[in-house]
C-alpha cells in the first residue's frame, strides 16, 4: 500500500539537514505511537529472515521547491513524499492516524497535511515500469586484509541482479513466511535517467555512515 502525502509548512518553509532520511524514519515511527508495542518491535527488532532484519516500509525522497546551503535544505512551500509498506498492521495504523490528525512535526518544523492519496496496486504480467522514489541500495561485505569492508553495487555490476533477488527473496520470506514463486531482473541497459545518490545516516557508534544508492527509471 502507498501513502502519497503533501504538507504545508506552518511557518513558510521547511528546514532540514541535507541528509534528512533518519528524520523521515523518525517521523514514521512517531506515526505508529498509538500502538507503542508495534512501534517498538519495528524499531528495535523488525521482521527477520536468515539473519537479516527488515523494517518493511520505505520513505521516498522529499519533493518540492528547495534551496541548498551549508549542508541544509530549505523547502520553500509545500513538500511531498510517499510511504509504502506491504504490512497490513502498519498500513492500518497510518490510515487511522492520517484520518484523525493533520498537524505533524518533521524535525523542528510543524507541518500541516494538505493532501493525502492512499492506494494499492496489483501488477499483472511479467514486465513493469518502475520509477524510483527512493534510492535502490545493494551492498555486499568483503574481507580486505582481515578487515570487513562494504561495497555498494552499481546497476552495471555483474552480481547486481543476483544480490537484488537475494534481498527480494529474504524480504518476501520475512514478510509472508514463504518463499516467492518468481524472480526479478533489471536490465541495466534499460535504466534511464540513472543517477548515483549518496547520503549520510547516523551509525550505531555515533559516526555517520555513507550510503550509496541509485535513482532512475527502468
Predicted regions mapped to residue ranges:
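RNA-interacting cores
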Residues: 1-218
Amino acid at each position: 500500500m502507498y501513502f502519497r502525502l503533501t504538507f504545508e509548512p506552518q511557518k513558510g518553509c521547511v528546514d532540514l539537514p541535507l541528509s534528512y532520511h533518519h528524520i523521515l524514519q523518525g517521523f514514521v515511527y512517531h506515526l505508529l505511537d498509538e500502538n507503542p508495542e508495534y512501534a517498538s518491535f519495528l524499531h528495535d527488532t523488525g521482521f527477520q529472515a536468515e539473519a537479516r532484519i527488515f523494517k518493511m516500509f520505505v520513505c521516498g525522497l522529499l519533493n518540492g521547491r528547495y534551496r541548498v546551503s551549508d549542508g541544509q535544505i530549505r523547502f520553500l512551500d509545500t513538500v511531498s513524499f510517499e510511504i509504502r509498506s506491504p504490512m497490513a498492521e502498519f498500513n492500518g495504523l497510518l490510515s487511522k492516524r492520517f484520518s484523525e490528525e493533520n498537524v505533524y512535526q518533521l524535525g523542528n518544523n510543524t507541518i500541516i497535511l494538505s493532501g493525502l492519496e492512499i492506494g494499492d496496486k496489483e501488477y499483472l504480467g511479467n514486465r513493469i515500469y518502475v520509477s524510483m522514489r527512493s534510492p535502490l541500495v545493494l551492498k555486499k561485505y568483503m574481507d580486505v586484509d582481515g578487515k570487513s569492508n562494504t561495497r555498494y553495487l552499481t546497476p552495471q555490476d555483474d552480481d547486481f541482479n543476483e544480490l537484488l533477488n537475494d534481498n527480494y527473496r529474504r524480504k518476501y520470506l520475512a514478510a509472508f513466511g514463504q518463499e516467492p514463486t518468481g524472480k526479478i531482473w533489471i536490465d541495466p541497459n534499460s535504466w534511464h535517467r540513472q543517477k548515483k545518490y549518496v547520503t549520510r545516516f547516523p551509525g550505531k557508534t555515533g559516526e555517520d555512515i555513507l550510503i550509496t544508492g541509485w535513482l532512475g527509471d527502468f
